[in-house]
Amino acid sequence: AEMIEKRHRIEDALEAVKAAQQEGIVPGGGVALVRALPKKAGSTAEQIVYEAVKEPIRQMARNAGESPDLILEQVQKEEGSRGYNFATGKMGDLLEEGVIDPVKVTITALTMAASAAGTLLTTGYAIIEGE
């Protein structure tokens, strides 16, 4: 079972490298998604996507034992590739520090968020799992 897990991790890493080579990289740690946001969301669909793309950085903060709202606020004050490095616990230039995501992965995340927003808008009722 452990060997299978290691194999899957290696395969995932290889796919990420291929994706990065094909389409490039962006700052990781959820920063590229936050930077893609407009300053304010307008329509209901935009509001859903607006909140959805903030969730990866919030989850990483929770996983690191940090305050999701505080980390998100700090990252939103920064510009470019500056963000919170969860490995060091400090703000920094994530591209320089090697905290990166393939563009393809980031685009997929935005596409999925938009798809979820569309589904929610066309659904009469939804059961939402609370925290």
Task: For every predicted segment, state its role.
Residues 1-131:
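Extended, low-charge hydrophobic alpha-helical regions
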